[in-house]
């Protein structure tokens, strides 16, 4: 199974509502590595590495409206970028 790197910039009301914690929980459930970080402009940057199907599932959960996974906050838009994995380990909230 091919590994990929997903970088997702999540726009909306996603800071101060438990969004990074929720994202970390979802990524760990999907056995992905990476991080979820607040950006100074109010977005959250999610970086995930692992099998493409698992990264696509995380992206689907990030975008889904309304969320069937009890995602906190409100997501307006998710901008995604795909690339080569950098072999990070674990998933952390920054």
Swiss-Prot record:
| Molecular function per GO | acylphosphatase activity
Query: Does Calcium show up as a keyword for this record?
Result: no
The main enzyme category here is hydrolase
Which keywords appear in this protein's UniProt record, sorted alphabetically? Hydrolase
According to its UniProt record, which reaction does this protein catalyse? an acyl phosphate + H2O = a carboxylate + phosphate + H(+)
Write down the Pfam families for this protein, in alphabetical order.
Acylphosphatase
Instruction: Specify the domain of life of the species encoding this protein.
Output: Bacteria
Q: What is its EC number?
A: 3.6.1.7
- Acylphosphatase-like domain: residues covered: 5-94
The active site is formed by 20, 38
UniProt similarity note:
Belongs to the acylphosphatase family.
Q: What is this protein called?
A: Acylphosphatase
Q: Which organism is it from?
A: Corynebacterium glutamicum (strain ATCC 13032 / DSM 20300 / JCM 1318 / BCRC 11384 / CCUG 27702 / LMG 3730 / NBRC 12168 / NCIMB 10025 / NRRL B-2784 / 534)
């Amino acid at each position: 199974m091919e590994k990929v790197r997903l970088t997702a910039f999540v726009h909306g009301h996603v800071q101060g509502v438990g969004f990074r914690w929720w994202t970390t929980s979802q990524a760990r459930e999907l056995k992905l590595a990476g991080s979820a970080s607040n950006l100074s402009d109010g977005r959250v940057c999610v970086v995930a590495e692992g099998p493409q199907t698992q990264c696509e599932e995380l992206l689907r959960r990030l975008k889904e409206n309304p969320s069937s996974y009890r995602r906190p906050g409100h997501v307006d838009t998710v901008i995604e970028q795909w690339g080569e994995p950098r072999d990070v380990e674990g998933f952390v909230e920054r």
